[in-house]
Amino acid sequence: RCIANSYPVPSVQTVASSYPQRHSAPSMERFEVVPLEHRALVAYLQERCIPAHIAKEKCKEAHYSVNGKPYFAVAFENVSGGWELRNRYFKGCRGRKDISYLPWARDGPSTECAVFEGFIDYLSALTLGIISGADAIILNSVVNVNKAVPYLKGYTAINCYLDNDTAGRTALTELTAIYGSTMIDSSTLYSEFNDLNVFLVTQSFTKNTLSNENK
């Protein structure tokens, strides 16, 4: 269940611009990617208020070993063939670190693009239904801002859903310096929260609270 349904307040911490340590690619052995089906991983994303059908459509499931011990995680591919890995206890990357680019349609690029810092925020936007028709770029780390620049050329509107912390604001400033008024700060939607997923979880909590009060 979404954590908004399970706890009196959303159990999400607001973290400043610090990034979790990641396993290096050489430490991962017997790496395999399969369709997302593991109940623990689907449940993890559902706790972040991401519906199972969206999670299974956009994500994969990775199995690997570290020092002989088996692990599994939600996997999200980047443009270099690397994989962002995430589960309830771990955040890491397999292969080259890079951005992810997801066109909305197969028959050509959209006129709009949405930019996210991490793939959980991208899944949150799909859940909220706020990027219909727009292509998407996931930075997978704000250090990848420059890698996103070539992909952003030609769009008439670029909606940025970056984190409301120092790193996120810096990334927005860098992109705005290049694309000017084409760049739209969409973080105003969740200005009281650190990121879009925290906003989604809180919105779900509020709706559930009001629903219970009206019963």
Question: Where are each of the predicted segments found?
Answer:
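Short glycine-/small-residue-rich flexible loop motifs, especially phosphate/cofactor-binding loops
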Residues: 42, 122, 176
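Phosphate-handling DNA/RNA-contact segment within nucleic-acid enzymes
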Residues: 64-151
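TOPRIM fold recognition
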Residues: 111, 127-215
